[in-house]
Amino acid sequence: MAKRQLNRRQNWRIEKIQGERAARAAKRESRAVEALEGGDLGPEQTGLVIAHFGVQVEIEGLQGELAGQVFRCHLRANLPALVTGDQVVWRPGNQGDGVIVAQLPRSSELCRPDMRGQLKPVAANVDQIVIVFAPLPEPHANLIDRYLVAAEHAGIRPLLLLNKADLIDEQNQVALEALLKVYRQLGYPLLEVSAHQGDGMEQLKKRLDGHVSVFVGQSGVGKSSLVNGLLPGVDTRVGALSELTGKGTHTTTTARLFHFPGGGQLIDSPGIREFGLGHVSRDDVEAGFIEFHDLLGRCRFRDCKHDREPGCALLQALEDGRIQAQRMASYRHILASLPEDDY
């Protein structure tokens, strides 16, 4: 059944209702901020956003006596959207609460489009994106490549992580080895672990120590189990694979930041089945495929689409085996998913 198209008046009414709801929520929050600021607030200091709950955030103090303590803070109305990993300036209250007064500059941000296609940051100040996949649900190179393009576009180092290595068997071993070989040949760091059995977890901890990392990957690949294995006692809820679809159920609803003993931090974000790249251009996608770098600009035609054009450097590299067919298929699939204006 085709999706019903809304007319202009219906769209206007929906936006009006949503705007009124947002205004009421902002007004309530503004009154709470005014009440706090009218009381006995402490001096301004820096803090770290460790979780976001709509109009409020949890922050961890970074200075003085409050360092390491967690506070639920209100947001001033003029602040930009905050995400887990943001560093902020805040003032503490006397009831375990406080007020965020400013956002500090970000060194990086990981973004993706929301349902309306508008760019939305999901984590800040990340310097390592851990792309998690597993034998089950079946890994798809296209989804892995989407994450790699996103990491390259954001300037964040990627780490490929095959979890549930204990589920490798005769039925999936050949396909998995072929998949991993492609990324190893490209020079991407890759680890194989089993959160369930503990295999490879010490090596993973060493990779995470000293970095601000975020785990990404489709539901069911074991991100929550990895957190439980890395940080005993956190008890992130684990969901089983659906017997009907073979896909995972979402178990983490709010992005949270955790600390590792070695000084590194982990942002555990909600699992997603499809990672959109609507905010990137064709040039961004091409730049996200690292094996293309030395070939771009060498085609016969300046506006080459790398499809069927004669003298295409990428097609010649594909024929010569310097570009894997799997990666070229992913590249074309990602381009086809972009808005027409960017294609």
Swiss-Prot record:
Q: Start and end of every CP-type G domain?
A: 116-275
Q: Give the protein's function.
A: One of several proteins that assist in the late maturation steps of the functional core of the 30S ribosomal subunit. Helps release RbfA from mature subunits. May play a role in the assembly of ribosomal proteins into the subunit. Circularly permuted GTPase that catalyzes slow GTP hydrolysis, GTPase activity is stimulated by the 30S ribosomal subunit.
Keyword hit for Lipid biosynthesis? no
Q: What is its EC number?
A: 3.6.1.-
Organism expressing this protein natively: Ectopseudomonas mendocina (strain ymp)
Q: Which CDD domains does the annotation name?
A: YjeQ_EngC (cd01854)
As cofactor, the record names:
Zn(2+)
The record describes how the cofactor is bound as: Binds 1 zinc ion per subunit.
Q: What PANTHER family does the entry give?
A: SMALL RIBOSOMAL SUBUNIT BIOGENESIS GTPASE RSGA, SMALL RIBOSOMAL SUBUNIT BIOGENESIS GTPASE RSGA 1, MITOCHONDRIAL-RELATED
InterPro entries named in the record: G_CP_dom, NA-bd_OB-fold, P-loop_NTPase, Ribosome_biogen_GTPase_RsgA, RsgA_GTPase_dom
* Signal sequence annotation: none
Q: Which GO terms describe its biological process?
A: ribosomal small subunit biogenesis
Sorted alphabetically, the keyword list is: Cytoplasm, GTP-binding, Hydrolase, Metal-binding, Nucleotide-binding, Ribosome biogenesis, RNA-binding, rRNA-binding, Zinc
At the top of the EC hierarchy, this enzyme's class is: hydrolase
Q: Which residues bind GTP?
A: 163-166, 217-225
Primary subcellular site in the record, as a coarse category: cytoplasm
Q: Which family does it belong to?
A: Belongs to the TRAFAC class YlqF/YawG GTPase family. RsgA subfamily.
Name it: Small ribosomal subunit biogenesis GTPase RsgA
Q: Does the keyword Phosphoprotein apply?
A: no
A single cellular component GO annotation: cytoplasm
Q: Where does Zn(2+) bind?
A: 299, 304, 306, 312
What compartments host this protein? Cytoplasm
